[in-house]
Every structure is written in structure tokens, then in C-alpha cells.
Amino acid sequence: MSSILNFYRNLLSVPLSFLVKNNPIPQQPIEELSLDISQPIIYLLPYTSQTDLIIIRKNCLSVGLPDPLEENELGGQCLPRYVFLDEGRRFFKSKGAKSATIQIVEKYLELHRSLPDLNVQLVPVSVLWGRSPGHEKQVGLPKLRLLNSIQKTAVAIWFGRDTFVRFSQAVSLRYMADEYGTDASIALKLARVAKIHFAKQRMSATGPRLPNRQAMFNKLLQSPAILNAIADEAKSKRISKEKARKEAYKILDEIAANVNYEGLRVADRFLGWLWNKLYQGIDVQNAERVRKLALEGHEIVYIPCHRSHIDYLLLSYVLYHQGLVPPHIAAGINLNFWPVGMMFRRGGAFFIRRTFKGNRLYSTIFREYLAELFHRGYSVEFFIEGGRSRTGRLLAPKTGMMSMTVQALQQNQIRPISVVPVYVGYEHVLEVDTYAKELRGAAKEKENAGLVLRVIRKLRNLGQGYVNFAEPITLSNYLNQHFPEWKDSQLEEHSQWFNPAVNAISNQVMININKAAAINAMNLTGTALLSSRQRALSREQLLEQLKSYQRFLQHAPYSNDIIVPTDTPEEILTHVLNLERVGLIVEKDNFGEMLRLERSAAVLMTYYRNNIQHVFVLPSLIASIIFHHGAIQKELVSNAARKIYPFLKEELFLHFSQDELDEYVEKIIEEFTRQKLILCAENLLSINKERVRVLQLWMAGVREILQRYYITVSILQDTPNIAKATLEKESQSIAQRLSVLHGINAPEFFDKAVFSAFIGSLRSNGYFDKNGVAITEKLNDISDILDRIISTEVQLTIKSAVGKHEEVQEY
């Protein structure tokens, strides 16, 4: 029988090797699932299928896992390396019978009694043939395990490129044997748990059935909230209810997605081609966090940072290839143009107007539509920044969508809602040239198909893309911990806890995104070159600085979630030089090579530096304090950092608490000492003159931020009772003057929003009295610190400008 079975497998292997693509999930199961290949592995398949077994074997061999068709030799016994959990239609009866599976697992368990060093890993693994969830009108979904061989051949031809092999977290049979014993009841219990696991896994990969769009519209238009909004619309505009209802339908049609599975498959092909054309690869980290939430039945809300229009496509593509359901995406109405709007809508996009304040009908319909998506179990994605960042930094969160998400949790507390912040990064952003023009005052060009094609056509070799899933926030857990009264309150936004809770969650999302920063070659090279006032360094200096950055990130990482490049400094520099449109010029003289940024490229490179500015801002602050003092007690460094930190924390969404700050400052000092950038004699910190150039370049990351703080603090010291609007305007005006006189290229340096945020931070940290007048005694503490770490030249420019402002006011 075994020879016939082997012949059958060999026969199947030939067409399957051509028809079915290797798509293991995760892509590196040994590393991502922490599998120990020095210990035996047994693969658990959900049902009897020689076709699935052959595909699993093909994927196992491609990722370095043991061959499932070979046996495990243990304690003088030869046991199969795979078992089938359940029956399925097949030509040959084999070890797939359920009773045989239980016996095999029981034998593995018994071996752990006689072999104390044995730890067999039971790895559940299944094949996903296509990912269509079906539609609501369908009576039942096709069960692929019930397909006969001819049907599966047809499925392989149609879905072969969309077949995924899903490896799950291993179960340690050593643990099971030690904790629960080795009899048949334990094997049966494992089988029952595995059945539930495979069912959940299938649901997490396909999601709930796709809605009948018209039926959903009819249901929503009959909801009490929308009926009331229609009645109010008819009354306020003096129109008939029927006309108001038609307007409501029109709004709903404008908003709602129209997901089409075949459309997703076509989009997957196109996006695969697009990434290969534009980027050298997509680095995905921590997807297992999301897979775990999906298996546990969480409603998932993805909240990525917003760098580019391509973010919409990238995250859906990544999720699809990680075995997860592409989400419904809240997209700006500006993207609803032909033919992109139709394609996005079929891929899961639902469209939102930029503003709908005062439009009760629209806001009610949108809120009810979002709640319906949550109720039906669809994952959702929205960009909390509200728009793409033109500067490379995170923008202040817009809380409207988060408010609706928290309201949806209140209305339906059956399934937990988890927010998954996502860091999206690129070594080259498609629209970065456009951003630079807009920051110089050019009008924003309206999105259209021609613009998209022009951008894509002229770009290629843009380096790497990065998607890093940050630490999730389960809303009910967060609210229970920080706002326990949320469960007892009414369903209304005006509850005392509601707005503070929404703001706190939104802020935590931004913090978690920054904790998951993906640091790349462009970020590091741009940071180093922009730290030089001439935007130029010798090759030796640049490589030395890159090496310093890398060592710091290894020994004093900003967080456990950040992605750090493992290439050598030489490889990093070579990679950047090989990218297109970088604007990095290599010049040679008698002393060697110089690397210089073109002036026009400096603003563009600032974008990439700003992506990771939060990672280096604290070491930059510590370097500045030590450098400008020459020698200073460690405690004074910590005190100064504590005073400045609250403002940096709010501006750059830093994650350290006040207690954690002291510990991290100590780590920074230890690392600077290890690199011999500073000297430490007992508690006295001083400059190491032999390495002073590297320390000077470290300082630059915080220089412009501190200069902005100094501008606002100086104005407040001069005029404590100045109006907020005037303070913002004067701060911006002086910053513009400073940028011209001192050659500051950072586009956010004189951004009014940044000054507004700093003033708000001063207020929240107690630097204004109850009448809105600045408390000069407290401001003097900040000013004293800034006086010592800002160059005299810059101070004089600022003080002179503040003095002229005062003269104008008096005049």
C-alpha cells in the first residue's frame, strides 16, 4: 500500500510544483515561532489530504523545516512525522483515521517518560486554498476538505498562486506530559483543542462573509439613529422625508465599500508587480501579534502612520500575505476619482469627507456605518493623523474616528476591540518631492489618475519598505485600567470620561507607533549628514558616525520593538549611494572622499531624518548638555533632562515615564562612555577631545527643537501676558528669521502647529497661572538650561528679534 501511496504522491508532486506557489505563513517559521529543529517535530494537519501534505512538504523544505514524509527515530521506534486530525475524502485510507492519530500522539507522549531530554514539538499546519469568505446570501461555505481529487485539481489551477501554508505555534509535548500525563485522554484533549484552533484559524484568514450591499443599506436606513437624522434633515431644510431619505441613501452610497474577493486577487497580482518595480523588498515584523488577536476573536482596528498614498495598498497587501483579512479602510474622499476610487472601494475602502462638522445627517450615517462594520466583525483601518505627514514626523492625532470606535465598543461589548498601531516606513516616499514643493508654498495638486501614473512611471529602485506592527491596545482593558467608570456611563460623548479617554487612547497609539520605528539606511545617513552645518562629511567621518548610531541602538535601544539595520556602516552607505534620487554627491580631493547633500536634497533628506528623530532626541539632548558645559555632574545632567523632557515627550510622542527617564538617561551616559565620546570620573562627566567630532554630530538632533523652545520662552519672559494667538504668530515670525540667518532647512522649524503644541505643553505643565499669564519664575528655570546649550550667536539673534517685537508693540 505504501508503494502505491508514494507513487500517488510523486504523481501529484509534478503538477503541484508548477501550479502552487510556496507561501508559508509566517515566512520564517523557525525564527518567528521559536521552533527548535534539534528536537523532533510532528506536523498536525486538520484533515486527510495527500495534496495538502505534498504542498506542506514543499513549503517545509523551502524554509528549512524537517521533511514531513520522513520518520522520527526515537527510543528505538520509528514514528511518522505527520498526522491527520480528521477524515476527508480520499482514494487511499492511510494514517489519517482519527483513532490512528490519537494512538500516534499517545506514543509520542509516552516516549517523554523514558527520554528525559526529549521535547517533541506538535506543529499545527494547514493549507488555505483561496481566501474567499463567501457572501451573506450563500447557504453554506464550501469545505475544501470535502473536495475530491478532481475538484481539488481545479482549485489548484485557479487558486494555486493564492494558496498559503499556515504554521501555528508549536505545542510542547514535554510540557503536556509533565503537566497532564501521557494517557489517551490527553491526546484526545489535544485533538479537540486543535479542531477549535483550525476553525478559528480559517475564520481569521477569511473573515466574516461579505455583505450584500443593498441589504446593508436597507438595514442602516431603518436604524433609529438614521431615521431621526432623516427626520431632522427634512425639518431643517423643509423638504419631504422621502427626499431626505434619498439624500441619506446617496451619502451611504458615497461612503460604503463594495468588497470583491476576485478584485482583491487581481489587486494582489498588481501590487506584487508594483513592489518589485519600486522597492527591493518589504520588511514585516511582529505580525504574530495580530494573528494572535485574530485567533482570539478580537475586532481589529489598524491605525498606521501616514507617509504616502501607497500606505493604503501596502498594509492590505502585507496583511493578505500574513494570512490575515485585508481591512475596510477609511480613505479620504479626494481618492474617490476614476478609476482609482472604484478599485479602492472593491479592495475595502470606504470614503470619508475631510470635514462634516455641522452636517448631522452625514455624521450619523458615517457613525452608524462604522458601527455596523464592527458589529459584523470586519477589521477596520484608519489614519489617525488625518492626512499624510509632509515633514516626516507624526502629526497630532485627529480623534473623530477614535471617538466612533469607542462608541462602537460601548454599543456592542460582546467582542473585544483591539487597536493595532502600525509603523510604516520607506527609504524613499513616492510623494516626497511634492511634499517639499508644498512646504515651500506651492498649492496642493488635486489627486487624479494622471498624477498617480506620472509618479509611478518615473520611479524605481527606491530601497526597502517597512511594516512593523506595534504593541496592540485592547480598548476594554485600557478603559478598565484608566477610566473604570466607562462601563457605568450612558452612550454619549458628553460623559466626563469620554473625551479624556479618547485623547489618551489616541496619544497612546502615537506613542506605540514611534516605539515600533523601523530605522533604515536613509534615516541614519540623512541624520548624520544633516548634523553637519555644511551638510557634508568625509567618508571616514560619516562611517564613524553611522557606526556610533548603530552601537547606540544595539546597547541602548529606544524600545524593544524598533527595527535596527544589521548591515555594516560601509554596506549602509553603499546602499544609499545606489538608490535613485537621493541627491548625495561624492567629491574627491587630495585628502580623500567627501559626501555632500545637494541643497535641494537637504529638505528631502530632512523628511527621512524626522522619521526617527524621536529615537535620537534624548541622546542628542544629553550630548548637548555635556558638550556645552565641558564638564558637569551627572545629577545636573539628569535634572536638566527632567525639566526639558515633558515638552519633548508631548511633541515627539516619547514613551518614557518620569521614572523610566532617569534609567534611560543612565543608559545613554553608559553608552557614550563605552564609545569613549565622554569621560566619567566618579560622577563628573566631561568631553573626550579625541572623539569630540562624533559628540558634536550627536548634538544636532535636538538643536533646532531647543531653539524653537527658546524663542517662545524668551517672548513669554518679555511679555508674560501675551495672547496665545499673538505668541504663536511672533514665535513663527522669529523662527522664519532665524532659519534664513542660520541656514536651517527643517520644514517644521517655523510650523505654526509646532509652536501651538509647545504652548499647550507649557500650559499643561503648569507654566501659566489660572488667568493665562506666564509664570516667569518657572520659565527662568527652562531659560537657564537653554542658555547654556544654545549657541551665543543664535541666542543673540533671538533676543534681538524679541527686542524688536517689544519696540513694535510699544510703538
Curated annotation (Swiss-Prot):
Catalytic activity: sn-glycerol 3-phosphate + an acyl-CoA = a 1-acyl-sn-glycero-3-phosphate + CoA
One GO cellular component term noted in the UniProt record for this chain: plasma membrane
A GO biological-process term: fatty acid metabolic process
Family, similarity comment: Belongs to the GPAT/DAPAT family.
Organism: Histophilus somni (strain 129Pt) (Haemophilus somnus)
Domain notes: The HXXXXD motif is essential for acyltransferase activity and may constitute the binding site for the phosphate moiety of the glycerol-3-phosphate.
PANTHER family: DIHYDROXYACETONE PHOSPHATE ACYLTRANSFERASE, GLYCEROL-3-PHOSPHATE ACYLTRANSFERASE
Xref: Pfam families: Acyltransferase, GPAT_C
Compartments in which it is found: Cell inner membrane
Pathway: Phospholipid metabolism; CDP-diacylglycerol biosynthesis; CDP-diacylglycerol from sn-glycerol 3-phosphate: step 1/3
Entry EC number(s): 2.3.1.15
Designated name of the protein: Glycerol-3-phosphate acyltransferase
A GO MF term: glycerol-3-phosphate O-acyltransferase activity
UniProt xrefs under CDD domains: LPLAT_DHAPAT-like
Keywords attached to this entry: Acyltransferase, Cell inner membrane, Cell membrane, Lipid biosynthesis, Lipid metabolism, Membrane, Phospholipid biosynthesis, Phospholipid metabolism, Transferase
Motif HXXXXD motif, residue range(s) on this chain: 305-310
NCBIfam families assigned to the protein according to its UniProt record, in alphabetical order: plsB, PRK04974.1
InterPro entries recorded: GPAT/DHAPAT, GPAT/DHAPAT_C, GPAT/DHAPAT_LPLAT, GPAT_PlsB, Plipid/glycerol_acylTrfase
Membrane topology: Peripheral membrane protein
